[in-house]
């Protein structure tokens, strides 16, 4: 299994250039590039071609653009903006050699019926699939374990991607989001491992279902999530591609960028290596 770094882990104590430097130094294979902040910040002082050259001349490679945010159940203007943003991402993927775009469902306090969420998600993902196909890019849908997210359990997200039924549309499996809204391990056991494109590893403090938020995440293996169950099940269903460490903990942002990146690797490898060669 390959090791990836998700830039949320150093959101407030680093930038893309430093993330790349330290991830390369500490032996990461991939990086998920944050398109809402770290990439635009980088492009203020660098050309995209410089980033492409960096990846061509170093071990670390770009795994995903993270993320196309709130893709479903938008009004007409919002939908057009999503499509245009995604088309721009395709050109970035082409230049950098990025394999995936992470797509995050709408977060809202508005109550939307599940059938309407599914219908919109399937329609938009099918449209995105058509756009991505010529580029060879895959779409990884990330359900979010918050009550306000329109797609917040594994079973709901899996049903959507199976209904889309495209080879280039699958899931991000995030241990925090799976745990946070009480997703069922039995549902994961029945899933096709080929429909999981990226595994986000993390852990969390032990708050009740519905109360957990991203800032509650802790180093893998140091919290309440049964990561052994997640990893053993992922192995059983045939997933073995890439693990990406993604934390949002404010106290970790007070560390140096290098210490955060080094500790993220050490804690991830310690947990994952019981089940996968990494």
Curated annotation (Swiss-Prot):
Binds 1 divalent metal cation per subunit. SUPFAM superfamilies: Xylose isomerase-like. Gene3D superfamilies: Divalent-metal-dependent TIM barrel enzymes. This is Inosose isomerase. Pathway: Polyol metabolism; myo-inositol degradation into acetyl-CoA. InterPro entries: IolE/XylAMocC-like, Xyl_isomerase-like_sf, Xyl_isomerase-like_TIM-brl. Its cofactor is a divalent metal cation. One of its GO terms (molecular function) is isomerase activity. Its EC number is 5.3.99.11.
């Amino acid at each position: 299994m390959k090791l990836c770094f998700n830039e949320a882990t150093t959101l407030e104590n680093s930038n893309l250039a430093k993330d790349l430097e330290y991830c390369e130094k500490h032996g990461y294979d991939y990086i998920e590039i944050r398109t809402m902040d770290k990439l635009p910040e980088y492009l203020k002082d660098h050309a995209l071609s410089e980033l492409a050259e960096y990846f061509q001349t170093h071990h670390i490679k770009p795994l995903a653009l993270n993320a196309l945010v709130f893709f479903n159940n938008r009004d007409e203007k919002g939908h057009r903006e999503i499509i245009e943003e995604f088309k721009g991402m395709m050109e970035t993927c082409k230049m950098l050699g990025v394999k995936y775009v992470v797509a995050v469902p709408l977060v809202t306090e508005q109550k939307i019926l599940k059938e309407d969420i599914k219908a919109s998600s399937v329609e938009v993902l099918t449209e995105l699939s058509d756009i991505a196909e010529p580029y060879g890019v895959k779409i990884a849908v990330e359900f979010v374990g918050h009550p306000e997210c329109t797609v917040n359990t594994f079973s709901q997200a899996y049903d959507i991607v199976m209904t889309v039924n495209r080879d280039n549309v699958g899931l991000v499996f995030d241990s925090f989001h799976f745990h946070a809204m009480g997703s069922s391990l039995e549902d994961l056991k029945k899933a096709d491992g080929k429909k999981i494109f990226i595994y986000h590893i993390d852990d969390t403090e032990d708050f009740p279902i519905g109360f957990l938020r991203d800032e509650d995440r802790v180093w893998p293996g140091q919290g309440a999530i049964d990561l052994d169950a997640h990893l053993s099940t992922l192995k059983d269903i045939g997933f073995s591609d890439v693990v990406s460490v993604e934390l949002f903990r404010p106290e970790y942002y007070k560390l140096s960028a290098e210490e955060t990146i080094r500790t993220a690797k050490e804690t991830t490898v310690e947990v994952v290596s019981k089940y996968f060669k990494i």
